[in-house]
A protein has these predicted regions:
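Bacterial N-terminal signal peptides that target proteins for export
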Residues: 1-7
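Bacterial N-terminal signal peptides
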Residues: 7-16
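Catalytic glycan-binding domains that act on GlcNAc-containing polysaccharides
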Residues: 19-117
Length: 117
């Protein structure tokens, strides 16, 4: 019995460590930054590098993705059959493939993902 409990605890802990932060109150940036302190540090670094106000960056991310890392545009349907998406936008910023490739080329950050904050 104790081995089974230990296995269940290990499974739950390993699965919970894979989860990404999803704020439940997207209208309060202070609570979002309090829940995920790395986001504030990243926002400060972006502010320093690009000169964009933190509030503006967070407002754009809220509008584009509601702070969901894996959001994509909806798929159109034809008679209940899902069709291809009309846009390649993906992630927090909803950057399309050409814009994301331009960003990677300009910054040299080939390992960055659109779904990473």
């Amino acid at each position: 019995m104790s081995k089974m409990c230990l296995i269940n605890v290990i499974i739950v802990l390993s699965l919970s460590s894979c989860a990404t932060y999803q704020p439940n109150q997207v209208d309060d940036i202070c609570k979002i930054f309090h829940g995920e302190t790395d986001w504030y540090e990243d926002a400060q670094a972006a502010n320093k590098r690009w000169g964009t106000p933190i509030g503006l960056m967070m407002a754009i991310i809220k509008q584009e993705s509601t702070f969901r890392h894996d959001v994509k545009p909806p798929r159109p349907t034809f008679l209940f059959i899902p069709l291809p998406r009309r846009s390649s936008a993906y992630g927090y910023a909803q950057a399309q493939n050409p814009a994301w490739q331009d960003y990677q080329k300009a910054t040299g950050n080939w390992s960055h993902d659109r779904d990473d904050f």
